[in-house]
Amino acid sequence: MRSGSTARFVVIHRNANSLYTLIADGTYRAVSLGRNKWKSLVGPEGSLQPNCSKEGFNVVGTSRHSKARIGIIANNENDCLTCDSRIGYGTGGSHDDSNTCGNEARVSPDNGDKHIKAMGYILVQ
Protein backbone atom coordinates (compact mmCIF):
# COMPACT_ATOMS: atom_id res chain seq x y z
CA MET A 1 0.00 0.00 0.00
CA ARG A 2 1.40 3.38 -0.95
CA SER A 3 0.42 6.41 1.09
CA GLY A 4 2.40 9.51 0.21
CA SER A 5 5.84 8.53 -1.06
CA THR A 6 6.21 5.35 1.01
CA ALA A 7 5.10 1.86 -0.02
CA ARG A 8 4.46 -0.64 2.77
CA PHE A 9 3.68 -4.34 2.51
CA VAL A 10 2.41 -7.21 4.64
CA VAL A 11 2.47 -10.91 3.81
CA ILE A 12 -0.67 -13.02 4.11
CA HIS A 13 0.07 -16.73 3.85
CA ARG A 14 -3.02 -18.39 2.39
CA ASN A 15 -3.25 -21.39 0.07
CA ALA A 16 -5.75 -21.06 -2.76
CA ASN A 17 -5.98 -21.65 -6.50
CA SER A 18 -6.13 -17.89 -7.04
CA LEU A 19 -6.93 -14.61 -5.32
CA TYR A 20 -10.22 -14.69 -7.20
CA THR A 21 -11.26 -17.92 -5.43
CA LEU A 22 -10.65 -16.25 -2.07
CA ILE A 23 -12.87 -13.22 -2.68
CA ALA A 24 -15.33 -13.88 -5.53
CA ASP A 25 -17.97 -15.80 -3.56
CA GLY A 26 -18.14 -13.15 -0.82
CA THR A 27 -17.47 -15.66 1.97
CA TYR A 28 -15.62 -14.27 4.98
CA ARG A 29 -12.22 -15.90 5.41
CA ALA A 30 -10.34 -14.92 8.56
CA VAL A 31 -6.64 -14.13 8.82
CA SER A 32 -4.64 -13.28 11.93
CA LEU A 33 -2.24 -10.45 11.16
CA GLY A 34 -3.37 -8.28 14.07
CA ARG A 35 -4.39 -4.63 14.30
CA ASN A 36 -0.88 -3.23 14.43
CA LYS A 37 0.22 -5.02 11.26
CA TRP A 38 -2.77 -3.63 9.33
CA LYS A 39 -2.12 -0.16 10.75
CA SER A 40 1.50 -0.39 9.61
CA LEU A 41 0.28 -0.40 5.99
CA VAL A 42 -0.57 3.30 6.29
CA GLY A 43 2.31 4.15 8.61
CA PRO A 44 2.22 6.00 11.93
CA GLU A 45 -1.06 7.72 10.98
CA GLY A 46 -2.98 4.39 10.99
CA SER A 47 -6.08 4.46 13.18
CA LEU A 48 -8.81 1.98 14.14
CA GLN A 49 -11.58 1.85 16.70
CA PRO A 50 -10.72 -0.29 19.75
CA ASN A 51 -13.19 -3.19 19.37
CA CYS A 52 -14.21 -5.94 16.92
CA SER A 53 -11.01 -6.13 14.79
CA LYS A 54 -12.48 -8.51 12.20
CA GLU A 55 -9.77 -9.18 9.61
CA GLY A 56 -9.34 -11.24 6.48
CA PHE A 57 -11.02 -11.59 3.09
CA ASN A 58 -14.58 -10.28 2.52
CA VAL A 59 -14.78 -8.55 5.88
CA VAL A 60 -18.22 -6.99 6.42
CA GLY A 61 -20.25 -5.74 9.36
CA THR A 62 -23.50 -4.47 7.84
CA SER A 63 -23.77 -3.41 4.23
CA ARG A 64 -23.78 0.35 4.87
CA HIS A 65 -20.89 0.34 7.36
CA SER A 66 -17.21 -0.46 6.84
CA LYS A 67 -16.24 -3.39 4.66
CA ALA A 68 -13.09 -4.67 2.95
CA ARG A 69 -12.32 -7.30 0.33
CA ILE A 70 -8.93 -7.68 2.02
CA GLY A 71 -8.41 -5.92 5.32
CA ILE A 72 -9.67 -5.18 8.81
CA ILE A 73 -12.76 -3.45 10.18
CA ALA A 74 -13.15 -2.19 13.75
CA ASN A 75 -15.86 -0.73 15.95
CA ASN A 76 -16.26 1.40 19.07
CA GLU A 77 -18.97 -1.00 20.28
CA ASN A 78 -18.46 -4.63 21.32
CA ASP A 79 -19.89 -6.06 18.11
CA CYS A 80 -18.84 -5.97 14.45
CA LEU A 81 -22.16 -4.73 13.05
CA THR A 82 -21.69 -0.96 12.86
CA CYS A 83 -17.95 -0.56 12.27
CA ASP A 84 -16.83 2.99 11.49
CA SER A 85 -13.18 2.24 10.76
CA ARG A 86 -11.28 0.13 8.26
CA ILE A 87 -7.91 -0.44 6.64
CA GLY A 88 -7.48 -2.46 3.51
CA TYR A 89 -8.04 -3.08 -0.17
CA GLY A 90 -11.39 -2.97 -1.91
CA THR A 91 -12.89 -1.04 0.99
CA GLY A 92 -16.11 0.91 1.24
CA GLY A 93 -18.94 1.86 3.49
CA SER A 94 -19.80 4.67 5.80
CA HIS A 95 -18.07 7.86 6.13
CA ASP A 96 -16.45 7.75 2.66
CA ASP A 97 -17.56 4.99 0.33
CA SER A 98 -15.19 6.34 -2.35
CA ASN A 99 -12.12 5.43 -0.27
CA THR A 100 -11.45 2.02 -1.78
CA CYS A 101 -7.91 1.55 -0.48
CA GLY A 102 -6.44 3.00 2.67
CA ASN A 103 -7.75 3.98 6.10
CA GLU A 104 -11.09 5.45 7.19
CA ALA A 105 -11.57 5.95 10.91
CA ARG A 106 -14.33 7.81 12.75
CA VAL A 107 -16.11 7.64 16.14
CA SER A 108 -13.34 7.38 18.78
CA PRO A 109 -10.54 5.61 16.90
CA ASP A 110 -7.22 5.02 18.70
CA ASN A 111 -5.14 7.51 16.65
CA GLY A 112 -7.77 10.12 15.82
CA ASP A 113 -10.17 10.44 12.90
CA LYS A 114 -8.48 9.53 9.61
CA HIS A 115 -9.24 9.75 5.90
CA ILE A 116 -6.21 8.28 4.14
CA LYS A 117 -6.54 7.26 0.51
CA ALA A 118 -3.77 4.99 -0.74
CA MET A 119 -2.64 3.14 -3.85
CA GLY A 120 -3.02 -0.60 -3.41
CA TYR A 121 -0.59 -3.25 -4.60
CA ILE A 122 -1.50 -6.93 -4.35
CA LEU A 123 1.20 -9.41 -5.33
CA VAL A 124 0.17 -13.07 -5.62
CA GLN A 125 2.55 -16.00 -5.76
Go through each PLM region and give its residues.
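Mature extracellular or lumenal effector domains of secreted proteins
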Residues: 1-125
